[in-house]
């Protein structure tokens, strides 16, 4: 028999509240309750959550810190910020009689938390001391953003606190107003006008209340300590030691040798080694040593030379430096002992503390070995693979515009860290033309990584394509007979031509856009690929407008007092519609003539269509040879030409130029009232000479009428369509020449007995 399980747990009594009917209930305002809760949370900076007392929990009791600081109080007001900086300036000024107002460098320890605790007590502030410290630390790097201080207060703070001046406008203003001088870091080191500046205050001044700041100054490195470390390294290198590989044994010895120095003795050997590796070695080219000593140090430490210092070192020492910055060979010489730093005896003052900082592009010590050509090739293949979309088209990579650190996280073909690959790519992107890729592949790489193109690369690229460059020198488009490089889906509807530059070769330009010698431009481009050319209309249009051969045509066709009518923007087609449906639904105007046809399309106006298979630009006009035939006058009289007025044929909404030219004439057979029509000759047999002469006469007369109608068309267009562009008129003239040439070829085929493909 199954027993019933019972629990010994006693239920807790339920406390019930009974309201008295006679008691008046007050209405509670929820907004006041919420405001009260928020005020209570503001007052409590840290709250300890009480652990649960449930008997079912087996976890030990622990307290959890919950921060309740609100973000609304983190913003400093203008008065608070000015009060903070004026307090710092007063601390830097002398209060001793006879020296009141004189300013000295770094008299206060703004990095000490005790300093900001004292600042909070004196101003009776409500913020945390670290908030005052963070505010000062942030704006000391961009002090030009602090508004409300007088010019004298601002320049004194720049000098006393050694704040770097980061903007050129601020530097120019300080030079004009106070004749200040700067070091290579942008820190003010002296002035001819500010005579109240001192490097440090007199030792007799009372610094009571500021002893806590001196403790911070004792632990900071100065330029003297940097020089001591370099002397020690030179001695060890001369003995054959490796300061980087040996690490702690050498630097522990450095601490023992300088026990009397407070800064060095209070730090461990690991701290000195870390500072030497991160700060001193990358900034070796800034140190005041001779060039040969620096070259030996770069060689022994196996550290690459900064790019801006390579030329100087090569000129003075004759060292062989490879493309990565490493010294391959250095002529033998003796390493001299480094001389101590001597202060400059003038109105300038050297910074008391060391101004060396860790560079942003610091090379990892574990990755200092040279890259092999195979690794460089693997990096380029990875970049090319990542810059191709699903359709196989090269697109720009936004990550690679900067340093691209995250881009190489997926690079698995090497044991190096991705930070090292990133640093190597910064060097490789300047050596694209030295790779084994073809010109087209190099052009794709330049476009994908947004690398500015230099003059040598432009000379090579314009031999295969016409380039459109951005103001920064990067490639926006590259147009050739067989390819288009450039993402054109996000292009604006109207582009400013003066913002771009156009680089092209005249022969490649003619080959790309079609001439009489090359009648089928872009013939190898597929249909879906050619549709992308529609969106680059204005770039190609301005390309053609800059073409040198159009200058003569421009002078001949432009009307002096033509008033250009405002253009209406063409609505963008829907994504669901195909290119042909978008063409049918879009409005057609004379300035944006659209002719979307897979057989014989043409491009003109502001909307670029599929590239033509027939040329529209010809450097030389097509010249017809004079035709000889009998009884030409009688043939002309018998040929009935139906010629409609150009005004009726010119319908800007429905009729294109090609349709106008094809429909503006039609030939009829001679009158059959006097004699029956002659029988038709078979296709294979050549026509009789009399019939051939009659046919040639009709065709020649029809061509003449076509030219006459074309002139009437242009005259009508100039009178009624002032916005007809020069390039369009030139294209229409070229189209007329092509149609004339087609008639000539058809006549030759008739005379030879061949059939004509209509």
From Swiss-Prot:
GO terms for molecular function: G-protein alpha-subunit binding; guanyl-nucleotide exchange factor activity. Residues 30-48 have a biased composition (Acidic residues). Residues 49-61 have a biased composition (Low complexity). The keyword rRNA processing does not apply. Residues 676-689 have a biased composition (Pro residues). Residues 30-70, 668-690 are annotated as: Disordered. Keywords: Guanine-nucleotide releasing factor. GO terms for biological process: small GTPase-mediated signal transduction. The keyword NADP does not apply. InterPro entries: G-alpha_activating_GEF (IPR053367), SPK_dom (IPR006570). Expressed in some neurons including the head and tail neurons, HSN and VC, in a subset of glial cells, in the distal tips cells and in the intestine. It comes from the Eukaryota. A motif (GBA) lies at residues 653-666. Interacts (via GBA motif) with guanine nucleotide-binding protein G(o) subunit alpha goa-1 (in GDP-bound form); the interaction leads to activation of goa-1. The GBA (G-alpha binding and activating) motif mediates binding to the alpha subunits of guanine nucleotide-binding proteins (G proteins). Acts as a non-receptor guanine nucleotide exchange factor which binds to and activates G-protein alpha subunit goa-1. This is G-protein alpha subunit activating protein gbas-1.
């Amino acid at each position: 028999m199954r027993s019933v399980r019972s629990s010994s747990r006693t239920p807790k009594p339920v406390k019930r509240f009974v309201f008295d009917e006679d008691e008046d209930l007050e209405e509670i305002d929820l907004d006041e309750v919420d405001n009260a809760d928020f005020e209570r949370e503001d007052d409590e900076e840290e709250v300890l959550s009480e652990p649960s007392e449930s008997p079912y929990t087996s976890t030990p009791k622990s307290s959890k810190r919950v921060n309740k600081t609100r973000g609304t109080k983190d913003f400093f007001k203008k008065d608070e910020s000015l009060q903070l900086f004026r307090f710092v300036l007063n601390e830097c000024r002398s209060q001793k009689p006879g020296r009141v107002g004189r300013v000295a460098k770094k008299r206060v320890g703004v990095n000490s938390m005790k300093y900001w605790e004292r600042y909070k007590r004196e101003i009776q502030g409500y913020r945390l001391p670290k908030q005052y410290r963070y505010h000062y630390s942030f704006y000391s790097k961009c002090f030009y953003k602090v508004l409300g201080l007088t010019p004298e207060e601002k320049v004194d703070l720049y000098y006393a606190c050694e704040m770097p001046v980061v903007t050129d406008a601020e530097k120019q203003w300080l030079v004009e107003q106070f004749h200040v001088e700067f070091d290579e870091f942008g820190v003010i080191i002296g002035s001819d006008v500010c005579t109240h500046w001192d490097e440090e205050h007199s030792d007799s001044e009372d610094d009571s209340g500021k002893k806590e700041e001196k403790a911070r100054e004792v632990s900071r490195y100065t330029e003297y300590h940097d020089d001591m470390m370099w002397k020690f390294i030179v001695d060890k290198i001369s003995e054959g030691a490796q300061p980087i590989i040996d690490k702690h044994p050498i630097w522990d010895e450095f601490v023992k040798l300088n026990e009397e120095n407070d800064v060095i003795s209070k730090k461990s050997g690991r701290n000195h080694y870390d500072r030497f590796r991160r700060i001193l070695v990358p900034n070796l080219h800034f140190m005041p040593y001779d060039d040969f000593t620096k070259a030996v140090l770069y060689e022994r430490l196996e550290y690459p030379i900064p790019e801006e210092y390579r030329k100087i070192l090569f000129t003075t020492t004759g060292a062989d430096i490879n493309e990565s910055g490493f010294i391959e060979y250095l002529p033998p010489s003796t390493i001299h002992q480094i001389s101590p730093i001597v202060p400059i005896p003038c109105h300038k003052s050297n910074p008391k503390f060391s101004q060396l900082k860790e560079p942003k592009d610091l090379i990892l010590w574990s990755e200092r070995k040279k890259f092999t050509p195979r690794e460089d090739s693997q990096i380029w293949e990875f970049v090319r693979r990542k810059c191709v979309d699903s359709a196989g088209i090269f697109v720009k990579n936004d990550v690679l515009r900067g340093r691209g650190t995250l881009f190489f996280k997926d690079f698995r073909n090497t044991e190096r860290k991705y930070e090292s690959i990133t640093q190597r790519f910064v060097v490789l992107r300047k050596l694209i033309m030295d790779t084994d890729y073809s010109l087209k592949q190099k052009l794709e790489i330049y476009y994908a990584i947004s690398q500015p193109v230099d003059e040598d690369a432009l000379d090579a690229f314009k031999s295969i394509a016409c380039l459109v460059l951005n103001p920064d020198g990067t490639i926006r488009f590259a147009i050739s007979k067989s390819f288009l490089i450039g993402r054109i889906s996000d292009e604006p509807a109207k582009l400013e031509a003066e913002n771009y530059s156009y680089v092209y070769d005249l022969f490649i330009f003619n080959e790309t856009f079609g001439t009489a010698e090359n009648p089928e431009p872009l013939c190898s481009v597929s249909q879906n690929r050619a549709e992308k050319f529609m969106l680059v209309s204005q770039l190609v249009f301005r390309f053609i407008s800059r073409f040198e051969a159009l200058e003569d045509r421009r002078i001949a066709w432009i009307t002096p007092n033509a008033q250009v009518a405002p253009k209406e923007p063409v609505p963008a087609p829907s994504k669901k519609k195909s290119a042909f449906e978008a063409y049918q639904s879009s409005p057609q105007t004379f300035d944006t003539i659209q002719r979307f046809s897979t057989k014989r399309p043409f491009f003109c106006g502001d909307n670029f269509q599929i590239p033509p298979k027939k040329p529209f630009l010809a450097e030389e006009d097509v010249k017809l040879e004079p035709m000889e035939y009998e009884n030409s006058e009688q043939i002309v009289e018998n040929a009935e030409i139906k010629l409609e007025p150009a005004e009726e044929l010119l319908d800007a909404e429905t009729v294109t130029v090609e349709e106008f030219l094809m429909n503006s004439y039609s030939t009829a057979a001679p009158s059959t009232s006097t004699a029956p029509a002659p029988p038709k000759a078979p296709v294979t047999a050549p026509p009789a000479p009399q019939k051939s002469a009659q046919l040639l006469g009709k065709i020649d007369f029809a061509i003449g009428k076509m030219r006459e109608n074309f002139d009437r068309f242009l005259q009508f267009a100039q009178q009624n369509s002032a916005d007809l562009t020069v390039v369009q008129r030139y294209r229409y003239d070229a189209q007329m020449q092509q149609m004339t040439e087609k008639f000539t070829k058809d006549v030759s085929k008739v005379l030879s007995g061949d059939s004509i493909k209509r």
